[in-house]
Amino acid sequence: WAFSLATDYNPNCRILSMPFIGNLATTRLGLDPLAALVAATRNPSTTLDDPDVTGTIVERGRADINILWSESVDGWCQTPGENPVITTIIAGSIVNVNE
C-alpha cells in the first residue's frame, strides 16, 4: 500500500517544510527515513497516473531530481530546520544550486 507524506499548508497548519514532515514521520510514527523519503517523493508521483513522466529514474526519463547534501538517507529528515537540497535538476537541466 503506497501512501504519501505532504504538508497541509492552511490557516491552521502553516507548515511548508517537507524535512519537518519527514522528521515527524520518523520520530513520531516510527517510519524508516527511506520509507519517509519514498512517501514524500515517489509515492505522490503515482497520483499523476503517468509513469513515463515523473517519479522514476530511468533511461530517457524526464530527470527531475533533487540532490541532497547528506551522505546518508537519514539526513533529509533529521535536520528539519535546514534545506537538505543542494542541487535541483528539472528535465535534465540544473535549475538551482544551494551552497
Question: What is the predicted function of each stretch?
Answer:
Residues 1-68:
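His/Asp/Glu-enriched, well-ordered alpha-helical/loop segment
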